[in-house]
């Protein structure tokens, strides 16, 4: 399998060379030439110039990068041409799901670990619709609230889909602690959002919805949070805040405490020690 059935693409040339070396070390045998990998493990931007044919793989496995949509402005026109899941606010990983679907043979399997933001985000609606109409969900592990990657700020999920139209199927939902699981009907999911809950909890939700008024039906204007255009410049930690204020006390007038989505809990908030340089309302 390692010699004849494994293919890979990475945009980072060093990662490609390391992968080749690892495969050579695993398959090398005395007196035999090393396996040729130049046409199997390749360096390319797979979203824009995939070197392998569509409908040709039994399994696609990946850890798509979590790159915010603000950082991919230069390739958005190309993404819009190539992907039906394109929206102007979609983060980069969304397109890898559609690419995987295109690469798979019928009945092929896709396994990803990446951001779970598309479960609920508005920009994920087209992708959710594609999954519900064209794929069979096999297994979901939703890690909401549990840190999987130290350097990742977004919550993650493991998703296993099959390129097969759904047919009254059920799938496995594994708890984020990985110590329990339950079955769920794919038909219980909607393209408006993916909510993975056990049937008894889902029934309670339905009762509450019938008796109450949904937030979207209230006379409220709800918008996204602060859009800085460059978070790394405008969002700072405690040390940087103190540094700026020590240089000029007037800086304290434009540095405000910041609550991000991850800081908001069920019944309150936990301040994460981050601040916003708020020049917008301070001419």
Segments predicted by a language model, with ranges:
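Conserved SAM/SAH-binding beta-strand->alpha-helix loop
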Residues: 12
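Signature of N6-adenine DNA methyltransferases within the class I
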Residues: 16, 21-249
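Short, solvent-exposed loop/turn segments at the edges of secondary structure
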Residues: 1-2, 152-156, 272
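Conserved SAM-binding motif I beta-strand of class I
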Residues: 6-9
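Contiguous C-terminal substrate-recognition/catalytic subdomains in enzyme active sites
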Residues: 269-283
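Core structural elements
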Residues: 159, 262-263
């Amino acid at each position: 399998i390692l010699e004849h059935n494994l293919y890979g693409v990475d945009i980072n040339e060093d990662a490609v060379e390391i992968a080749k070396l690892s495969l050579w070390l695993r398959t090398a045998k005395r007196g035999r030439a090393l396996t040729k990998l130049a046409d199997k493990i390749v360096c390319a931007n797979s979203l824009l110039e995939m070197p392998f044919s569509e409908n040709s793989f039994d399994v696609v496995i990946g850890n798509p990068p979590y790159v915010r949509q603000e950082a991919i402005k230069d390739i958005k026109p190309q993404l819009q041409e190539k992907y039906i899941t394109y929206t102007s606010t979609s983060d980069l990983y969304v397109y890898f799901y559609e690419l995987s679907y295109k690469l798979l043979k019928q009945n092929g399997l896709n396994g990803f670990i990446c951001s779970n933001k598309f479960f609920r985000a508005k920009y994920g609606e087209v992708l959710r619709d594609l999954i519900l109409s064209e794929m069979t969900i096999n297994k979901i592990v939703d890690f909401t609230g549990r840190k999987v990657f130290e350097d990742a700020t977004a919550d993650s999920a493991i998703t296993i889909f099959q390129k097969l139209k759904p047919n009254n199927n059920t799938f496995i939902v594994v708890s984020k602690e990985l110590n329990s699981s339950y079955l769920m009907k794919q038909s219980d999911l909607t393209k408006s959002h993916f909510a993975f809950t056990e049937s008894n909890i889902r029934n309670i939700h339905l009762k509450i919805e019938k008796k109450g008024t949904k937030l979207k039906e209230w006379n409220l204007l709800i918008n996204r949070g602060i859009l800085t255009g460059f978070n790394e410049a405008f969002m700072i930690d405690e040390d940087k805040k103190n540094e700026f204020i020590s240089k000029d006390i007037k800086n304290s007038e434009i540095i405000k405490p910041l609550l991000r989505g991850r800081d908001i809990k069920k019944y309150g908030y936990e301040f994460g020690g981050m601040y916003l340089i708020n020049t917008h309302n301070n001419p």
